[in-house]
């Protein structure tokens, strides 16, 4: 499994130790998501773009007709996956590009403060949420929402990123 991270934020001073810890955390979360749903790990590629509110607003407007920033967008390469998918591929030697996840770090920072937890926890949640969308999960109705939320919380808890309720 390969996770490619592109940081498109402009004018942001990046602390190397934070970037390295995010890379490791996000790779572990990607593995955990894939393993949890039984998706093949070998030769799987995922792209993550870290961006700002303005860039994600433009993408949200273009692809969802919602002209406002959002926290996370996902663009799956495998159309038609659903949360009951049986992940078998015709050519086991071919690489599998799962898709792209875009996270607005600006929105993640606001939400972390609003929810009273760390930015690391919020980034982890948004990444897992995006991963599950790439894997066919959705939250269009209450049943889907409950199933997806339970899986998100299980993965985050197993990685030590559970919510701290005060």
UniProtKB/Swiss-Prot annotation:
Annotated residues for binding of Zn(2+): 129, 133, 139
Keywords assigned by UniProt, alphabetized: Cytoplasm, Endonuclease, Hydrolase, Metal-binding, Nuclease, Ribosome biogenesis, rRNA processing, Zinc
GO molecular function, one term: RNA endonuclease activity
Cofactor(s) named in the record: Zn(2+)
UniProt-annotated location(s): Cytoplasm
PANTHER family: ENDORIBONUCLEASE YBEY, CHLOROPLASTIC
Name recorded for this polypeptide: Endoribonuclease YbeY
Source species of the chain: Heliobacterium modesticaldum (strain ATCC 51547 / Ice1)
Taxonomic lineage of the native organism: Bacteria, Bacillati, Bacillota, Clostridia, Eubacteriales
Gene that specifies this protein: ybeY
